Curated annotation (Swiss-Prot):
Catalyzes the acyloin condensation reaction between C atoms 2 and 3 of pyruvate and glyceraldehyde 3-phosphate to yield 1-deoxy-D-xylulose-5-phosphate (DXP). This is 1-deoxy-D-xylulose-5-phosphate synthase. Its EC number is 2.2.1.7. GO terms for molecular function: 1-deoxy-D-xylulose-5-phosphate synthase activity; magnesium ion binding; thiamine pyrophosphate binding. Its cofactor is Mg(2+); thiamine diphosphate. The keyword 4Fe-4S does not apply. It comes from Salmonella paratyphi A (strain AKU_12601). Mg(2+) binds at D152, N181. SMART domains: Transket_pyr. GO terms for biological process: 1-deoxy-D-xylulose 5-phosphate biosynthetic process; isopentenyl diphosphate biosynthetic process, methylerythritol 4-phosphate pathway; terpenoid biosynthetic process; thiamine biosynthetic process. Signal peptide: none annotated. Keywords: Isoprene biosynthesis, Magnesium, Metal-binding, Thiamine biosynthesis, Thiamine pyrophosphate, Transferase. Belongs to the transketolase family. DXPS subfamily. InterPro entries: Dxylulose-5-P_synthase, THDP-binding, Transketo_C/PFOR_II, Transketolase-like_Pyr-bd, Transketolase_BS, Transketolase_C, Transketolase_CS.
Amino acid sequence: MSFDIAKYPTLALVDSTQELRLLPKESLPKLCDELRRYLLDSVSRSSGHFASGLGTVELTVALHYVYNTPFDQLIWDVGHQAYPHKILTGRRDKIGTIRQKGGLHPFPWRGESEYDVLSVGHSSTSISAGIGIAVAAEKEGKDRHTVCVIGDGAITAGMAFEAMNHAGDIRPDMLVILNDNEMSISENVGALNNHLAQLLSGKLYSSLREGGKKVFSGVPPIKELLKRTEEHIKGMVVPGTLFEELGFNYIGPVDGHDVMGLISTLKNMRDLKGPQFLHIMTKKGRGYEPAEKDPITFHAVPKFDPSSGCLPKSSGGLPGYSKIFGDWLCETAAKDSKLMAITPAMREGSGMVEFSRKFPDRYFDVAIAEQHAVTFAAGLAIGGYKPVVAIYSTFLQRAYDQVIHDVAIQKLPVMFAIDRAGIVGADGQTHQGAFDLSYLRCIPDMVIMTPSDENECRQMLFTGYHYNDGPTAVRYPRGNAQGVALTPLEKLPIGKGLVKRHGEKLAILNFGTLMPEAAKVAEALNATLVDMRFVKPLDDTLILEMAAQHDALVTLEENAIMGGAGSGVNEVLMAHRKPVPVLNIGLPDLFIPQGTQEEARAELGLDAAGIEAKIKAWQA
């Protein structure tokens, strides 16, 4: 997509923040309007995160107008809302390539631009990093400002509060901006409150406050009276008591779509000392009515026609694995009142919408709090219930200690339904489910299952749910199922694989949903094909049998080779002193960038042609 100068005349003048700061302030509302329209035009053509960026247009313009970026450090939490930031920082003409192979990264990325101070993708990291950056700048004597932008969802995470508690203790010079888009702009976000925010952040008020503290520091009763009076005045109009108690100077809430007001407030706050907190109210999806009405649906979008106001409907093909899980969850809950389902803010992505509606008293969205989700599940299990934690592979990493300390050590029957395992695609390095087999396999008493299709996935969910001797995990990929027939639910024998095809000389031991590719390769090479099913416990007997009957073995998994299922097979063979050649095929020792799942698998040699080529090259 080429940039249309005639359609966006003001935006055409801005390809860097230096050019932005040359614009007269009066032209900024027009710039915001053009930026929002350009974002709509670009993302609707290319796909990507959508509604969040529409809500941060004015904030982005104001921040880059007031602060001397990239010298001043601007940190975006998660990064869904950072598309306008990318457009204004030299990437305007490439925004149509975002999330595509070889294109712009889906999130702020240090290797992409000097304006991207922190590489992100996961939630609630900005304030912790911001404190470190601010402290480093202070120790180096660099007169630079540090600003962190965090959303109302991300700030609920414990890590954000841990960081704010630390900031209140060491008091670095930094600004945290809470982008609150949970609701429409409330009544107290109007002219009076904006004026008050500018007054409270202004030099006169700050000087009076600090001067008063110094003058009356030796008169404790008067000093305490001043403090109480200040808190009373601010408390009448602002909900910032919590942040004040953490040691921040709280300002807000203010209208996050008033670019001129934001500039005034940011200028006032820019040189204040100590940790500052600005609370802005925005509308997710701002400027595009369908996204304003349904920001969840329009959070991330495929290519669509903006004039229709609708996203394209699915082709009605095969269900995704998330739906397979969601259907099983509802089916099981209808039969067992002990089932409790937990998600850390991923209801839609994990296929739990229907469950949340049918069984609201047994559905728990704990917000972005993976650590709490796991230990909460442990508590439910102790109380006699059957918790199922639905979580993405990449997010389960954040609760690793809880899996070990609070669940596995106590042998609690918590089941982890691990979605987005393996290659995820367009969200790139931060979201690939590359490590779960490696980091779970070493935990004692953990049962780990890798289904090869949707029917096996259901059977494994059923098996894991009814296993009472410790935690279980079923990992399944992003994307559609394979269309196999669904059979009645029954428990699988723990730790037992299944030979799918008998061949000669070579045996392929497959773990998971690469089975269709493995079947093609086995046919082409006349190899034996085994559906291993369990990563832990491994079917040692079957592995040794395959080693005795074949000249070589190949293990196949969509997980990091290091420490993965293939490593487990190697350990079994070495423990039994079986010197059989083994080729481990899986994800290499690198962070896999964005692109479609098909593109990534082809590049990594994990499609049928690539797997066959790897085996032939190894055998040569």
